[in-house]
Amino acid sequence: MMITLDHVTKQYKSSARPALDDINVKIDKGEFVFLIGPSGSGKSTFMRLLLAAETPTSGDVRVSKFHVNKLRGRHVPKLRQVIGCVFQDFRLLQQKTVYDNVAFALEVIGKRTDAINRVVPEVLETVGLSGKANRLPDELSGGEQQRVAIARAFVNRPLVLLADEPTGNLDPETSRDIMDLLERINRTGTTVLMATHDHHIVDSMRQRVVELSLGRLVRDEQRGVYGMDR
């Protein structure tokens, strides 16, 4: 099992209602899962728990071999090396080229220069940006910037890719291209967990759907659509 949440509850002191309430979810290696639900349903907390950015109030969180809520200090970066993250707002380094943005993800974990020089061009080819390695982010379209962000998340070949509204700032055609790319990455064996509000993407792809509402798990459905009655 790649991801396990076992009776996980997260209670913030500032709220009377738990952000997550007794959540039980298991995700296998290589699955593609949509995490859906309205704002405030607990999606962001769910993902932050996987990254050890939050600690559950009760229950167990596991990612691959990592017992996440028992990790301490120096072990947290080891967990994050096996998880790639993609966000709605790209979060690129504006003064670095496409190549250097992707290479930076390997530099910070101490990869050798020869390995970086070998792997980065391969990943840029995968995301369709081989010809734009020397461009700066402000010279790219929104879709191209998201491709850079995906390349950066994938360059270390993570076991899990977390995508938080990766198409939220993109037009429908560009969104479809980004989803095609995420599907290709998923086919390499990477587990993909994507939080989204995009009905059209969820309905067209018919992947597993995990739905949260007010911190509770209300649906876990294979080949699901966005709404239960659609």
From Swiss-Prot:
UniProt xrefs under InterPro entries: AAA+_ATPase, ABC_transporter-like_ATP-bd, ABC_transporter-like_CS, ABC_transpr_LolD-like, Cell_div_FtsE, P-loop_NTPase
Membrane topology label: Peripheral membrane protein
Keyword set, alphabetical order: ATP-binding, Cell cycle, Cell division, Cell membrane, Hydrolase, Membrane, Nucleotide-binding
Organism domain of life: Bacteria
GO biological process: cell division; transmembrane transport
Pfam families linked to this entry: ABC_tran
SUPFAM superfamilies from the UniProt entry: P-loop containing nucleoside triphosphate hydrolases (SSF52540)
GO molecular function: ATP binding; ATP hydrolysis activity; magnesium ion binding; manganese ion binding; transmembrane transporter activity
ABC transporter domain location: 3-228
Binding site for ATP: 37-44
Cell compartments where the protein resides: Cell membrane
Assigned GO CC terms: plasma membrane
Assembly description: Homodimer. Forms a membrane-associated complex with FtsX.
PANTHER family found in the cross-reference section: CELL DIVISION ATP-BINDING PROTEIN FTSE (PTHR24220:SF470), IMPORT ATP-BINDING PROTEIN (PTHR24220)
Family: Belongs to the ABC transporter superfamily.
Role, per record: Part of the ABC transporter FtsEX involved in cellular division. Has ATPase activity.
Name of the protein described by the UniProt record: Cell division ATP-binding protein FtsE
Gene: ftsE
